[in-house]
């Protein structure tokens, strides 16, 4: 059995990444969402084990000490991390896994897993990003400004480190672009070695 592929998706806060990721998981078979660990509080109807594993700071820092994360980062005073064992369990079963992580976490994963496929979701403009952050009504004006400043100074230029860039101007088009990337990566000959060889054998080859 071929190992699964690791897909990374990153974006500035408010670019629509989480909505696209949820849609892609429902749309593409054998694609598993990596449930990250975080020390932040749940928002709205978020549930532990579904959107995130919500843990306190002490638990998270103990996991860091025990090297249980393939990546982790501190974003706006909260920790986020991807557990090593969860990722390995999925890819060893031949399934693809999708990591919804920030640019710092993505850089860590690329160093440890050089064959990952990375996708950067870009908002169509600064003004659109600002409006989206305001409309979702999750943050106060001060926090929104911090997120915009972080996006402008740190995150937006990170697109250069990614394999693919999707501009989320139209949700349906952005979703189809993400789906196309996953399906195209699955057609790479390196992912299909066993299946190709079994077909060749039917032609009398070895």
State where each predicted segment sits.
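Extreme N-terminal, non-catalytic leader segments
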Residues: 1-6, 29
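P-loop (Walker A) phosphate-binding loop of NTP-binding proteins
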Residues: 10-12
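ATP-binding Walker
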Residues: 15
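Walker A/P-loop
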Residues: 18
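Post-Walker A helix-loop "phosphate-sensing" segment adjacent to the P-loop in P-loop NTPases
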Residues: 25-34
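ATP-dependent small-molecule kinase phosphotransfer cores
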Residues: 38-97, 104-107
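Conserved phosphate-donor/acceptor-positioning beta-strand/loop module used by diverse small-molecule
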Residues: 97-102, 111-136, 167-168
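Small-molecule kinase domains that catalyze NTP-dependent phosphoryl transfer to phosphate-bearing small molecules
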Residues: 138-206
